[in-house]
């Protein structure tokens, strides 16, 4: 179709418009669904704690979540700034090596914060919340490990987005949501808030590794190999 706007002729290809519209719909739907799934399964533990354990456990667990994941914004900021270079890179092997370097950087920065929480967590809890919240210490340490896995998961997530894996992400997050509900229930019932924290680690680990390895002939597996089997 020919359109004239301000004296200029424009040819509008209806087939291309349909193609790009479908692509944008699928891409947007994938990101929205995966984002909702992430938000949901990160809150499942709190809901199940309230139902299976007690309201006080929810309060203690909320403190553990707040402190154990409080440093996550640092790694997220680092990932966001680093990925502009990765997205602009056309060579797959170079992209994998850049993502692997970012993976290692996020890993070691996360280890630093985990060490701070491990050695200073009890003092921080007593200072901020009082001795009645000391029971949040072990879940807090476990959740800091979960936050490390989540940060590494963001590196993989962004790498999948680079290769337009929006539909894959939406399916993966939906599957993880279905897995997390029974897993959290069976761990929370006998172990309470510690079980809730353990379920977070298990879910984040499965999401980071096995589930991602199905994408694009194991490109995430190759990135992980480059991260920890080959150094700078």
Predicted regions: what is each one?
Residues 145-172:
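Membrane-interface junctions at transmembrane-helix termini in multi-pass inner-membrane proteins
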Residues 55, 119-148, 194:
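Interfacial segments at transmembrane-helix termini and the short loops linking adjacent helices
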Residues 121, 126, 174-209, 221:
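Membrane-interface helix-loop junctions in multi-pass transport and translocation proteins
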Residues 1-42, 88-97, 219-232:
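Interhelical loop/hinge segments that connect adjacent transmembrane helices in multipass membrane
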Residues 38, 61-80, 109-113, 143-150:
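Transmembrane helix-bundle signature of multi-pass secondary active exporters and lipid flippases
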Residues 68-93, 157-162:
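Helix-loop junctions and terminal segments of transmembrane helices
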Residues 21, 25, 93-108, 115-120, ...:
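Interfacial transmembrane-helix starts/ends
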Residues 30, 45-47, 57-75, 105, ...:
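Alpha-helical transmembrane segments of polytopic membrane transporters and translocases
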